[in-house]
Amino acid sequence: MKCDDGKAYCAAPVNIHRIDWFWANKKVLDSNGIKMPTSWSEFNAAADKLQAKGIIPLAHGSQPWQDATVFEAVALGIGGNKFYKKAFVDADTKTLGSSTMVKIFDQMRKLKGYTDPGSPGRDWNVATGMVMEGKAAFQLMGDWAKGEFAAAGLKPDVDYYCAATPSDNGYLYNVDSFIFFKIKGQDKVEGQKLLASLMMGKNFQKVFNMYKGSIPARL
């Protein structure tokens, strides 16, 4: 658990998510002779081919957080680890205004052209459903999308493909946590401890993360 020296809160992590994944409908890709892309140029070529046949290349919900998810994956893939850290951790102005950043926005513009008119405001799981149903070929989404495929009874390499988005071995991740604030009342404190212990229990971690598509915070 992460605490701020016991002053106001403690945070109990429940999982670790990798964000930069491509999900794809196996039947759509196989029937069009397309493999999971290992570079952005390969993805663009595949998307152009699919679009020419009237297939939506990229299922996406153009909500701010989903746009940010795609942008970060593209930035890491094109710029690399050092570029990403300088741009988004250090906020280095030279990096933010570089030719590499222009390439990143060029790729984002391409991706926008591969989505359908219904993209704005679409929930992420609806976009995942488009891939599952063969209405679209790809989705760029975190590993929580696996939970949708699993709930539908679909299996990897049988019904769908998944692979990391193109990068130089970098990756993006986040941690889901429950925050416990400092409160008065021993009964409330004991309740917090019980909830934290249950969430960090091995059985809960195994079952929860299997369905969530994430990595257990505790192995």
Per-region residue spans from a language model:
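Short helix-initiation/N-cap motifs at beta->coil->alpha
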Residues: 40-45, 118-133
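A local structural motif
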Residues: 31-36, 109-123, 135, 153-159
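Glycine-centered hinge/linker elements that transmit conformational signals in sensory
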Residues: 47-50, 89-120
